[in-house]
Amino acid sequence: MTGLSKDIAQPTSGAPMVKAEGVHKSFGLAHILKGIDLVVNPREVFCLIGPSGSGKSTFLRCINHLEKISAGRLYVDGDLVGYRQKGDKLYELKEKEVAAQRRDIGMVFQRFNLFPHMTALENVMEAPVQVKGETKAVARERAERLLDRVGLGDRKGHYPAQLSGGQQQRVAIARALAMQPKLMLFDEPTSALDPELVGEVLDVMRDLAEDGMTMIVVTHEMGFAREVGDSLVFMDDGLVVESGHPRDVLTNPQHDRTKSFLSKVL
């Protein structure tokens, strides 16, 4: 799979693709994110690792305002996510404005969340037609091209139940790309797959990286992080514990918590 660059929206502001400043998130009394500061640059593959419950997936969901942050600021391509600032005050955006921001952000979940009553092709066409108002002809042409790119051109008429888990996840990636996002968020995209199916999904993500897609990837696939990642953050207990180039962090961790975690997964 190559040649996806025409389906990748380019950043427009000259700002970092993602910037988090003191991001906190609480659910009731549970303090999940405890002051996250990080920067993701355009075209970067940014990997988040850490134990379950460390806040990785919650942070990912905050980036596109599926979860509202409790304090701090989150920016995507220079735009404040979910809010408008006037003076010192923040005003929450209307749902229509939030939806417009989300159009630039593709998200791929652990579970594929495909519409079971739609074919692979229809799943990929749905959002461009319903959300962006594209004609079916335009949406179909892009959907067919994207399914070809993820190696499923011969499965476009299949329903999700007729596809393997790896094939369903590749359809989900094509569906996210159909909106021509400038940023892709991957929340443990291989964790629900049988081991023999993991490689085909990682191959698609590797090709996306080569085509210049900015990606934030929550993953337990340390080999992928080492080979493809540009930056890596280890999170634990809602905090960024350690960050750096993946090879440096994975081969020479500096923090005891990072060392303990990696000793169990490598």
Regions found by a protein language model. Name each.
Residues 1-13:
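Short, low-complexity, intrinsically disordered N-terminal peptides in bacterial proteins
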Residues 2-4, 234-237, 243, 247-266:
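C-terminal boundary and immediately downstream tail of ABC-type ATPase nucleotide-binding domains
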Residues 13-246:
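ABC family nucleotide-binding domain
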